[in-house]
Amino acid sequence: MARYTGPSWKISRRLGISLSGTGKELEKRPYAPGPHGPGQRKKLSEYGLQLQEKQKLRHMYGVNERQFRTLFDKAAKLPGKQGENFMILLETRLDNLVYRLGLARTRRQARQLVNHGHILVDGSRVDIPSFSVKPGQTIALREKSQNLAVVKESVEVNSFVPEYLTFDAEKLEGTFTRLPERSELAPEISEQLIVEFYSR
C-alpha cells in the first residue's frame, strides 16, 4: 500500500486525531469529512476499532503499510511487550526524531528534509527517513541547510523537546540520549488493539 499523499486534515478528521500536531484541523470540524456533516459517528465493530487504531498510528508516523508491518514483526523478536517495542521502534525513525527536535513542524516536512539530504547523523549525510537512530547518535543539519526558512520557523515556534533528546538551538544539533519510555509516547494510542489486529 502506497503512502497517502493527500491533505492530512482529511485523515485527521476521519480518524479523530491531529496529524499536524496543532489540533487546528479538528477545532472547527471535529467530525469525519463528507457531505453528511457532524452526524453521530457509526459504532465500530471490534475489528473496526482495531483497524482504526492501526491506521491512527500508521498515519501519525507517516509510514506505508509494508514499513509498518515490517517494524511490527521486528518488535516481536525483541524482549518485552511487542506493542511497546513497536511504538519505540517507530519513535527511533530518523524523520520522526528530526520532527521531535523541532527542526520541522510536521513529520511530513521532516521526511522531506531527510529525503533532500539536509540531515546528518554522526556527521554523515543520511537520506533515508526510516533510518533507525541509536541512543548516543547525533542529528544535525548540514551547514549549507542551516539557513532554510522552514527550519528557522520551526525552531522559533517549537517549545518542547522530549527528555530522551537534547537539542542545541544555536548549532541546530541534537542527540538521541536514550530509548523513550512507553509513558512518553502517544497516550491516545492503544497499541494492544494493533497487536490484536495483526494476530487475527
Swiss-Prot record:
Domain S4 RNA-binding, first and last residues per copy: 92-155
- Asked whether the keyword Methyltransferase is assigned, the reply is no
- Keyword line: Ribonucleoprotein, Ribosomal protein, RNA-binding, rRNA-binding
Q: Which SUPFAM superfamilies match?
A: Alpha-L RNA-binding motif
Matching InterPro entries: Ribosomal_uS4 (IPR022801), Ribosomal_uS4_bac-type (IPR005709), Ribosomal_uS4_CS (IPR018079), Ribosomal_uS4_N (IPR001912), S4_RNA-bd (IPR002942), S4_RNA-bd_sf (IPR036986)
GO cellular component annotations, sorted alphabetically?
A: small ribosomal subunit
**Family designation:** Belongs to the universal ribosomal protein uS4 family.
Q: Which PANTHER family match?
A: 30S 40S RIBOSOMAL PROTEIN, SMALL RIBOSOMAL SUBUNIT PROTEIN US4M
User: Assembly and partners?
Assistant: Part of the 30S ribosomal subunit. Contacts protein S5. The interaction surface between S4 and S5 is involved in control of translational fidelity.
- Function of this protein? One of the primary rRNA binding proteins, it binds directly to 16S rRNA where it nucleates assembly of the body of the 30S subunit.
Name of this protein: Small ribosomal subunit protein uS4
